[in-house]
């Protein structure tokens, strides 16, 4: 005997699920709800309890009879006040009503979010008054238009022995969630494989791409102008293969970071005379993480030092064992520069495609991924799209990431205008309102108004997410956050006076690795720390490191407002030491520098035996006699020292406030120029 659910047994034996569950509890048999499966032994016990002949009327049937009696009484009372004609009419109507068949109660109902009492009654094939009575018995006062929550709906439905299922509605603005849903098998048709070529620098990736392109472009397309749109197709044995002509690693990192899976097969290019190199290992990791098949192309076989056996031996360490050695990885010896082995490689790609059975449904609205995008002065926004499912047509309304529009024109990889593009076809389109990012998903829609609405909603959601409050962190509380597990990566923005310093600092900072927390440099630049640097730091939750440069007035104000930690240094090893100390929890500075004001040099005077006097105007804060100063020229610190004199007219003063003029001389420094900024600072003790 097969297992049966509680509500199914109740229905079979014409009893309510509630009564059955009560009976089961009396028999010391635990059931959680009406969906619980009953074992054969339990069913046999129940059969003994409910003899086959003794059929109990269900609660629903009892209520139906009661309802008819009530209705009949009401009608008879009304008819006492009416004439004979009305009585005959009533009898006719009553007779007609008696002939109306009873609507069967459904086995299952579905709902989304909530239902009103009226809607629930309709779904359960019951009168609203009946549902209201049941709710009243449960202590819930409800009207016909009142919304019921999920628990109440399930409670009422369970009482009738009806299964309830809640539908989860996915907003069309989040089309990524259903863009990859599989279509019915009968609608799927074979599509070309999408191939990415990866490998170490100078192992021949670009040469291989060029060799394939030059040898396999269809003869009929020879007159077409080959243009770089980020992807192209070739014909092999009457079948097409799509190659992504973009940096291989970028395809995996940037696109996979946005949830896009575009590659079907990876070609790993390894030079026969060089073997496995660091980027080769990185490429293997990317391909394995993406879960795509790997075909190894052993390139440069024309060189005298070529040693394919060595390559195979080295790759076995990374679980890429050749078929000849009992593994399942395809190895193809080639010479990209001479065009040898290219045909064999392409045949292997077709073989893998055949085994993997790449399919898509061309008879639906298109969906896919952005490969490249740019802004052209003449054409506007241009985006290269890879159609992964469906068919894209000129004129289709489309949403791409947070941008939207209508496909105005489509250009193929050979520069020809096309009207349709099927699965695995790369095309360049125009017509979007803004430039999307590589890896953004796209979807075509039937209605332009709907596409615009979805695009605007997505853009608004992205803006809200970007503006969302983030907990800023500084070096002082960094160790605590690391200990609590809140920080796995430290974002830094590095600015310096010259490019060499930027590169040296970035290289040194990237090597820091304390307690599994790594340093990530999100931006570098030469020159003063600007307001845009602070805004980027705020959005990325980053710390700004300045080497021999200073923030301008706006940057400083924004940093205070956004609570961004800005660290300024003049010695590289001090920067590294400070970051490492902060990560290890040993950062304990006794003093902290506090900038108290800035003055702009408006005019200079050279005086014998005194030196250069700077006529200044205090633009921010105040300048004090005992403060340290630094001279900033075009955002770069050119000198750091002490004030020699501070005067107002001819009098020595202790301080000069904002919006006042003053005369300043700097100890042991006379090369002051108009436009220089004199920044005053003091060292304050930090309370720990």
UniProtKB/Swiss-Prot annotation:
Function recorded in the entry: One of the essential components for the initiation of protein synthesis. Protects formylmethionyl-tRNA from spontaneous hydrolysis and promotes its binding to the 30S ribosomal subunits. Also involved in the hydrolysis of GTP during the formation of the 70S ribosomal complex.
Main localization, broad class: cytoplasm
Region (G4): 299-302
Keywords: Cytoplasm, GTP-binding, Initiation factor, Nucleotide-binding, Protein biosynthesis
Region (G3): 245-248
Region (G5): 335-337
Region of interest: G1: 199-206
Example of a GO MF term: GTPase activity
Basic residues bias locations: 71-83
Organism: Bacillus mycoides (strain KBAB4)
Matching PROSITE patterns: G_TR_2 (PS51722), IF2 (PS01176)
GO cellular component: cytosol
Protein name: Translation initiation factor IF-2
Chain spans, region G2: 224-228
Domain of life: Bacteria
Family under the similarity heading: Belongs to the TRAFAC class translation factor GTPase superfamily. Classic translation factor GTPase family. IF-2 subfamily.
